[in-house]
Amino acid sequence: MKFVDEVQIRVDAGDGGNGCVSFRREKYIPNGGPDGGDGGDGGDVYLVADENLNTLIDYRFERFHAAERGENGQSANCTGRRGKDRILRVPVGTRASDEDTGELLGDLTHHEQKLLVAKGGFHGLGNTRFKSSVNRAPRQKSNGTPGEVRTLKLELLLLADVGMLGLPNAGKSTFIRAVSAARPKVADYPFTTLVPNLGVVRGENSRSFVIADIPGLIEGAAEGAGLGIRFLKHLERCRVLIHLVDICPVDGSDPAENAVTIVRELEKYSPELASKPRWLVFNKMDLILEEEAQEVMDRVKTALNHEGPVYAITAISKEGTKKVCYDILDLLDTMPRQLAEDAKDAIEKVEFKWDDYHKNQLAKAEADALAASKAFDESLDDDEWDDEDDDGVEVIYVRD
């Protein structure tokens, strides 16, 4: 199945049902009063994380998704049925944002997590809601509000503990094949890897971690060269980065310059991502003499001003790969996963269109009824008879 990690869709929440104007009419009850019911709320649109999905390809072909409209109110104070919600299932790791405003709506980081992305319209009020002591037979009602409409940008960010960086043909896919059961394509030409690959590395005592292999970066990737930097987003949730350096490039380029290029492109994309713990791993040690290898490693460390861990491996023969994996497991044990908490803290409360509408609607109805009652009382005061102010002739009728 084709890997699709970014799509744009439109979601339409359901409109609210209209209120009803109706009066109770039964035998021997000619003036029964208002009995118009409220409409039903419109259905909401939710995203739900599903661990059985690994791509957003379904939304590449179906881009319009709408919830059900609420039913109108009916007589006998019958409330309209609420519209059915629309549930959109997406892979775990999906991030949703509003394409028009850029507002981040939420991250779905665990199975069956539910995220509201479009709120249904509020129901209209029936004429029963508008009755008062001065308005015994109200003929006003309110219509339901339209449901929220959003254009969503869905991005799939892979959930991996360790991410791999490097130039094309540095040996990233060979490394992930050596340490896990993943089988990405390996060949002797650049950009063999076109989409991210995940592998699970298992250690002793049931310890394990997930490693992500993304397509290689080249100079100018931030400006769109090669495959660009669109896949770097998959490393944002990684806790550790492995910078894989080809110690003996087949094109004769300088490994130090190549390493600096990768770090420079990483910093252009995201300084926060560049600040993550980064390990330097030199690959293809079998192609160079030990003395030359040490000199190259020293030059690369100096060029990068690297003070973190450094490893030398030969991925094709798995030499040195085991120590790298076991050291990563030890490091991850000291770095508790705080993905869900960090995501929750990073996202501010999302405001939806009709959050407080029902409060405002009822408050307005009460204010209108109060104003009408006050006006009626004032009219009674103006019509009261005052004998002291009457200078006319008093007429007295006497029965014979």
From Swiss-Prot:
Domain OBG-type G: start-end pairs: 160-333
The EC number(s) this enzyme carries: 3.6.5.-
InterPro entries (UniProt xref): G_OBG (IPR031167), GTP-bd (IPR006073), GTP-bd_Obg/CgtA (IPR014100), GTP1-OBG_CS (IPR006074), GTP1_OBG_dom (IPR006169), GTP1_OBG_dom_sf (IPR036726), OBG_GTPase (IPR045086), P-loop_NTPase (IPR027417)
Gene Ontology molecular function: any one: GTPase activity
One of the record's GO cellular component terms: cytoplasm
Cofactor: Mg(2+)
UniProt-annotated binding residues for Mg(2+): 173, 193
PROSITE patterns: G_OBG (PS51710), GTP1_OBG (PS00905), OBG (PS51883)
Location(s), subcellular: Cytoplasm
Keywords: Cytoplasm, GTP-binding, Hydrolase, Magnesium, Metal-binding, Nucleotide-binding
GO biological process: ribosome biogenesis
Binding site for GTP: 166-173, 191-195, 213-216, 283-286, 314-316
Cross-referenced Pfam families: GTP1_OBG, MMR_HSR1
Domain Obg: 1-159
Family classification: Belongs to the TRAFAC class OBG-HflX-like GTPase superfamily. OBG GTPase family.
Alphabetized PANTHER family for the sequence: DEVELOPMENTALLY REGULATED GTP-BINDING PROTEIN-RELATED (PTHR11702), MITOCHONDRIAL RIBOSOME-ASSOCIATED GTPASE 2 (PTHR11702:SF31)
Record's function text: An essential GTPase which binds GTP, GDP and possibly (p)ppGpp with moderate affinity, with high nucleotide exchange rates and a fairly low GTP hydrolysis rate. Plays a role in control of the cell cycle, stress response, ribosome biogenesis and in those bacteria that undergo differentiation, in morphogenesis control.
Assembly description: Monomer.
Name this polypeptide is given: GTPase Obg
